[in-house]
From Swiss-Prot:
It is a peripheral membrane protein. Belongs to the UPF0161 family. Its main location: membrane. One of its GO terms (cellular component) is plasma membrane. It comes from Corynebacterium efficiens (strain DSM 44549 / YS-314 / AJ 12310 / JCM 11189 / NBRC 100395). This is Putative membrane protein insertion efficiency factor. It holds the Pfam family YidD.
Length: 99
């Protein structure tokens, strides 16, 4: 069985694989240099979208993590109420879990 991941946005596991590490580096670059250029907080979710993307790539790998981050970004707008939306645990989509 897969270990559940922490809901704490400060607890982000190390990404596995070169593609996941590169994507995590891109997200960290955005967080450090680009995110502060926006005026005020604009994310309606907890954790914020960049932290969600970083954690999803670190936990689920480059492909599934990117898909999860893209789905999250697609929800980010006035048409969605936002709120708490954690990264799903590994194995969430397995046939045993979804039934």
């Amino acid at each position: 069985m897969c270990e559940p991941i922490s809901d704490d946005p400060q607890v982000i596991p190390q990404p596995k694989g070169p593609a996941a590490k590169a994507l995590a580096g891109a997200v960290r670059f955005y967080q450090k240099y680009l995110s502060g250029l926006k005026m005020g907080s604009t994310c309606r979710f907890d954790p914020v979208c960049s932290t969600y993307a970083l954690k999803s790539v670190s936990v689920h790998g480059a492909v599934k993590g990117t898909v999860l981050a893209a789905v999250r970004l697609a929800k980010c707008g006035p048409w969605h109420p936002g709120g708490f939306d954690p990264v799903p645990n590994p194995g969430y989509w397995s046939t045993e879990t979804v039934r």
